[in-house]
């Protein structure tokens, strides 16, 4: 297996006791990414929650553009940032407390590798492409499309520092998988086998 690598970007991603608990979503808005699932889950959180969902990505259809504008208007926990440069996206991620990957189907995602490289823990839909990187025993999964389960998971992560540290430690153990030198070595090995 060749894991997509990512350089580390340093940020301040430990939860502040007096600020927002920032949950980053990095996804162009298209149905297979289930892009507004995190925003919908955040709407159901208790009023005391400090969760703010920061969504980076552009809508790929008029219908998705209407949906994201409607979500922005009705959800005070949701901040749609639109399409940002790669460098700016990486900085927003590095300064977030959590990455949420809600895809219905995909291989592993660039954002997942970038989160792991930058020590940002992840909540993820339980699909094979993401499990291939995070492992079967990762405690931050929720069933695909299950808003209630994601709400419960977000609430637990925000309110239980031990659980948050457990996710962070699990992702830290995965960091060697996404080191650029490891990816380069894996490609060299594969290409040598093909010669």
Predicted features and spans:
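Short beta-strand->alpha-helix junction loop in the catalytic core
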Residues: 1-12
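Conserved donor-binding/catalytic core segment of Leloir-type glycosyltransferases
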Residues: 15-33, 38-43, 53-56
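Short, structured helix-loop element that forms part of the nucleotide-activated donor/catalytic region
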Residues: 52-77, 81, 88
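Short alpha-helical donor nucleotide-sugar binding micro-motif in glycosyltransferases
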Residues: 83-84, 91-96
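Aromatic "clamp/platform" in nucleotide-sugar-dependent glycosyltransferases that forms part
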Residues: 104
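Short hydrophobic beta-strand element within catalytic cores of glycosyltransferases
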Residues: 121-124
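Conserved acidic donor-binding segment of nucleotide-sugar-dependent glycosyltransferases
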Residues: 136-148, 156-161
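A charged, aromatic-enriched C-terminal amphipathic alpha-helix characteristic of glycosyltransferases
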Residues: 162-192
């Amino acid at each position: 297996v060749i894991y997509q690598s990512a350089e580390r970007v340093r940020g301040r991603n430990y939860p502040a006791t007096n600020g927002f608990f920032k949950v980053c979503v990095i996804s162009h808005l298209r149905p297979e990414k289930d892009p507004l699932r995190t925003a919908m889950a955040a709407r159901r959180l208790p009023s005391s929650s400090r969760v703010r969902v920061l969504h980076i990505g552009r809508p790929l259809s008029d219908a998705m553009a209407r949906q994201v504008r409607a979500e922005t208007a009705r959800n005070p926990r949701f901040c749609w940032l639109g399409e940002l440069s790669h460098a700016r996206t990486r900085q927003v991620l590095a300064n977030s407390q959590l990455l949420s990957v809600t895809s219905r189907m995909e291989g592993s995602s660039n954002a997942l590798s970038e989160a792991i490289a930058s020590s940002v823990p992840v909540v993820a839909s339980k699909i094979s492409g993401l499990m291939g990187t995070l492992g079967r025993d990762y405690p931050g999964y929720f069933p695909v499309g299950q808003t209630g389960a994601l709400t419960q998971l977000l609430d637990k992560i925000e309110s239980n520092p031990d659980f948050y540290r457990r996710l962070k430690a699990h992702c830290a153990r995965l960091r060697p998988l996404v080191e650029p030198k490891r990816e380069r070595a894996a490609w060299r090995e594969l290409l040598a086998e093909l010669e």
